[in-house]
């Protein structure tokens, strides 16, 4: 009961905060536009203040509005009253926007289904990107000799989109039919993960490391684990997501294992480009079989790594995508 009361209190306190933030952006935005002599206004997808505040600034100044949608807005799992505001404002904001940037083709298709084919003329796909210089070159088949214990690595935050799939992997490793540990590198505190039901054990190690260390950690893995969950409260989010860590994984030089629903764009993207082993059913036996094959089939590992690098340089290179972004923001 105490936890429920605390959650209700947080919700009530959040109501004035979102409106105050929107008001601050709407008040300061026009001043900044005039001071900088800005040609466009860019609003980034969030839980409301940036999207709505950017829209109000656009209306006040008459400057074109560009949206950068890292995630869905309407239909996302947003704190109250963010979901209500998103349902009201997203159609209005999308109608007025000059350009809409999304991070994958799946999200573009989603918005075309939601708002009609004409919205597609406004949408530019710019995939999540990193600079490849942070990663070593020619990593194919590096450290692929047989080992007494293999390492499955997950890097990044853990919350509802990944949670049940990570728990499923932990359960599979607990059967001792796979000669591997799961090494989690997450900025989430161990207490937070424990509250989610994730704790250290015989087959699970929980670590933390600076962002600068992540390339080295990913390069040392035997498998890079990329999960999305089934039966969540935000299926639209699951189906349109391309997690930011995918970009890092593609260039890390180690095979990727995607454990996610068949309906997700992530699974479709991986299959189209053959850059990852994919388990698209919530099936523990299938997950176990694919992991064991991926650990021992060196030709398959090499093929996936090579295709991952090709996909990175085709869609995820920051050198290329920065030019696309610049062109989109200035046209």
Task: Give the location of each predicted region.
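A charged, aromatic-enriched C-terminal amphipathic alpha-helix characteristic of glycosyltransferases
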Residues: 282-288, 298-329
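Acidic anion/phosphate-binding donor-loop and adjacent secondary structure
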Residues: 78, 129-148
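Nucleotide-activated donor-binding/catalytic signature segment of Leloir-type glycosyltransferases, i.e.
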Residues: 149, 177, 186, 191-223
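A short, active-site helix/loop in glycosyltransferases that binds the activated sugar's phosphate group
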Residues: 93-122
């Amino acid at each position: 009961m105490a936890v429920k009361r605390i959650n209700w209190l947080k919700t009530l306190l959040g109501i004035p905060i979102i409106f105050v933030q929107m008001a601050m952006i709407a008040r300061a935005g026009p001043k900044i536009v005039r001071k900088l002599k800005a040609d466009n206004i860019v609003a980034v997808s969030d839980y409301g203040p940036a999207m709505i505040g950017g829209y109000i600034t656009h209306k006040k100044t008459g400057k074109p509005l560009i949206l950068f949608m890292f995630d869905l807005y309407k239909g996302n799992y947003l704190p109250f009253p963010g979901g209500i505001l998103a349902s009201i404002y997203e159609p209005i904001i999308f109608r007025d926007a000059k350009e809409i940037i999304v991070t994958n083709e799946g999200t573009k298709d989603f918005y075309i289904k939601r708002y009609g084919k004409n919205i597609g003329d406004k949408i530019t796909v710019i995939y999540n990107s990193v600079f490849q210089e942070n990663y070593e070159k020619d990593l194919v088949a590096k450290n692929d000799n047989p080992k007494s214990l293999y390492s499955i690595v997950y890097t990044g935050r853990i919350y509802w989109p990944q949670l049940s799939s990570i728990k499923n992997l932990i359960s599979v490793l607990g059967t001792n039919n796979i000669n591997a540990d799961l090494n989690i590198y997450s900025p989430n505190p161990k207490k937070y993960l424990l509250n989610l039901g994730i704790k250290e054990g015989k087959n699970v190690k929980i670590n933390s490391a600076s962002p600068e260390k992540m390339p080295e950690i990913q390069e040392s893995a035997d498998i890079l684990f990329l999960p999305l969950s089934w039966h969540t409260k935000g299926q639209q989010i699951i189906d349109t997501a391309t997690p930011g860590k995918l970009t890092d994984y593609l260039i890390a030089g180690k095979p990727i294992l995607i454990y996610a629903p068949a309906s997700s764009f992530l699974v479709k993207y991986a299959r189209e480009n053959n850059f990852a082993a994919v388990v698209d059913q919530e099936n523990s036996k299938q997950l176990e079989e694919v992991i064991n094959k991926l650990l021992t089939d060196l030709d398959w590992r090499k093929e996936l790594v090579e295709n991952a690098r090709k996909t990175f340089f085709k869609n995820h290179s920051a050198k290329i995508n920065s030019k696309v972004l610049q062109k989109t923001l200035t046209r």
